[in-house]
Amino acid sequence: MMRVIILLLTLHVLGVSSVMSLKKKIDGPWQTIYLAASTMEKINEGSPLRTYFRHILCGRRCNQVYLYFFIKKGTKCQLYKVIGRKKQEVYYAQYEGSIAFMLKMVNEKILLFHYFNKNRRNDVTRVAGVLAKGKQLNKEEMTEFMNLVEEMGIEEENVQRIMDTDNCPSKIKP
């Protein structure tokens, strides 16, 4: 009986440890490097899904994530905060309709994400993106992103380097 209790406690500690490790990796400043979408117009300059990420916070046990990003409207950058709530492995949020998204850590400096956006007219757009702590991706990181783009059924020519048009404030207070 004592062995079972020790085993259960060990498994619980390992589970908490992995959540804390994930939280430590996700929390912090991030910048959008590339975006790709099934409908190019949705990520063109001035479009609502062209997101210039700045910060992600992982809530308790990472069951919620707080996404902070800018959208450009003309020459002005407007800051948004969107809360994703996790159900199983997928986060759900409200922004330009409903969004179902997933996050994937490549390493401590690279985070891939993909989502489905269903707007008010029930049109669905598939989006893939890569966030980074730096300004460049190495060859392996770019390959991993392009594999995600392909898995999402997004055409390679629909990939845009977002970093080049990002002139929104670099720091925010989440």
From Swiss-Prot:
GO terms for cellular component: extracellular region. Keywords: Disulfide bond, Secreted, Signal. It is found in: Secreted. Its main location: secreted. The keyword Secreted applies. One of its GO terms (molecular function) is small molecule binding. The keyword Oxidoreductase does not apply. Disulfide bonds join C77-C168. Residues 1-18 form the signal peptide. It comes from the Eukaryota. Transmembrane segments: none annotated. PANTHER family: LIPOCALIN, PROBASIN. Belongs to the calycin superfamily. Lipocalin family. This is Probasin. It comes from Mus musculus (Mouse). The gene is Pbsn.
